[in-house]
């Protein structure tokens, strides 16, 4: 049924049938994507929500008129359930930075793609908002108290309660309201992409292109920065995150003055909020819909939460207490231990025999260090040093 409808659109647009139609993998949404191979090759989309489809179709045309890199939509069905758009290829930014994500060591090419992407964001937020009719946005036209509390309760019901934790709902709701008040201090008329992260950026000709922006609305600039730089599985080291923040602020100054102290102070509240929002999504898509990608992302988001809570949020005392307890649950601490690489360095004397392999796998490395003097034989004393100290590297 879906492929037949997409084929009709393809024929109406090109005058001939596609050579082949292949369904593409989907992730979090209920939209289905197909590649219609032919001359030209196009992407066909089938979406169950007409309102969401219309939001995308309107925004795609609006952004193209503003010169932003988004796929062109060529034809749509009369009921707006199906449409054909430009094929941007298969290269997601998420995949392009795979080596860095897995090692936390990002090469220069990966960093350059990230710089280009984060510097593009202010253009989306400001130029994208210029002349936009926000009434097309779905399900909300703007970032407001109602949408904030929706997301916080999404976290509460789809993730927090799913862990079996006990908590006082009235005290938690009090802190939710405080958070909404803090986040709304930063109201603005800019476009908030809402899900600006490396899975929603494609790389074509070494340049970033934007997809999946149909959930966008009017809102503050901080949310998208938090979404991108604190994406759970992106695994950006803090040094790279700070570098990209500077790139963003530099690009932002083209559109408005920036008080950096206020910017950073406000951003950390959005980072906490976004982390809770994605945990809610991971809970629903992973625990309830059983989608493996979302289940696999939970430990990374929990680790983000651990790092965030190292600095206090005095505005939300009860919420932070519950979040700390959440990060200490056995199911998350056990998973953290599984993901940590443990390297043990020991020494032994051959005259006592080869030591027992405690791992049971027979692996490892043995280095013959008999020609190396013991540090204790040097005139300079090294007894005050420990392995984590820089000077100890010289031994």
What are these regions (language model features)?
Residues 1-14:
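Juxta-kinase regulatory segment immediately upstream of eukaryotic protein kinase catalytic domains
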Residues 30-36, 124, 179-223, 235:
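Active-site acidic catalytic loop and adjacent metal/ATP-binding pocket
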Residues 37-142, 148-149:
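ATP-binding pocket architecture of kinase catalytic cores
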Residues 54, 93-116, 133-193, 204, ...:
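ATP-dependent phospho-/nucleotidyl transfer catalytic cores
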Residues 153-162, 221-257, 272-288, 301-308:
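Active-site activation/catalytic loop segments of kinase-like enzymes and analogous catalytic loops
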Residues 280-336:
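ATP/Mg2+ or Mg2+-diphosphate-binding catalytic cores
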Residues 339-381:
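Glycine-rich, flexible N-terminal cofactor/catalytic loop recognition
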Residues 383-390:
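Conserved small/polar residues in nucleotide/adenosyl-binding loops
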């Amino acid at each position: 049924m879906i492929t037949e409808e997409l084929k009709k659109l393809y024929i109406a647009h090109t005058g001939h049938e596609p050579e082949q139609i292949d369904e593409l993998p989907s992730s979090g949404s209920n939209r289905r994507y197909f590649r219609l191979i032919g001359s030209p090759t196009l992407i066909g989309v089938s979406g169950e929500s007409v309102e969401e489809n219309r939001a995308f179709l309107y925004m795609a045309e609006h952004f193209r008129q503003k010169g932003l890199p988004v796929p062109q939509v060529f034809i749509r069905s009369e009921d707006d359930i199906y449409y054909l758009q430009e094929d941007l290829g298969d290269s997601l930014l998420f995949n392009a930075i795979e080596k860095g994500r897995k090692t936390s060591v990002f090469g220069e090419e990966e960093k350059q793609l990230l710089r280009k992407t984060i510097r593009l964001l202010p253009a989306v937020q400001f130029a994208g908002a210029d002349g936009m009719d926000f009434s097309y946005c779905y399900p909300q036209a703007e970032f407001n108290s109602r949408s904030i509390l929706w997301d916080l309760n999404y976290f509460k019901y789809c993730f927090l309660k799913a862990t079996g934790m006990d908590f006082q709902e009235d005290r938690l709701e009090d802190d939710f309201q405080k958070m909404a008040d803090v986040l709304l201090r930063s109201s603005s008329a800019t476009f908030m992409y809402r899900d600006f992260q490396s899975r929603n950026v494609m790389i074509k000709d070494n340049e970033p292109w934007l997809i999946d922006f149909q959930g966008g609305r009017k809102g503050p600039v901080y949310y998208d920065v938090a979404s991108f730089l604190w994406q759970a599985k992106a695994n950006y080291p803090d040094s790279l995150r700070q570098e990209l923040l500077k790139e963003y602020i530099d690009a932002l100054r083209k559109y408005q003055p920036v008080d950096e102290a206020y910017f950073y102070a406000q951003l950390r509240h959005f980072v906490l909020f976004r982390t809770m929002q994605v945990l809610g999504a991971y809970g629903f898509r992973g625990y309830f819909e059983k989608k493996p990608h979302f289940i696999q992302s939970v430990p990374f988001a929990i680790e983000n939460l651990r790092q965030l809570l190292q600095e206090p949020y005095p505005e939300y005392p009860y919420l932070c207490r519950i979040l700390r307890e959440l990060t200490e649950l056995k199911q998350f601490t056990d998973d953290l231990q599984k993901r940590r690489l443990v390297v043990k360095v020991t020494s032994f004397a051959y005259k006592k025999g080869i030591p027992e392999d405690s791992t049971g796998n027979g692996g490892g490395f043995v280095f013959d260090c008999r020609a190396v003097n013991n540090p204790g034989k040097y005139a300079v004393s090294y007894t005050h040093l420990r392995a984590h100290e820089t000077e100890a590297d010289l031994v």
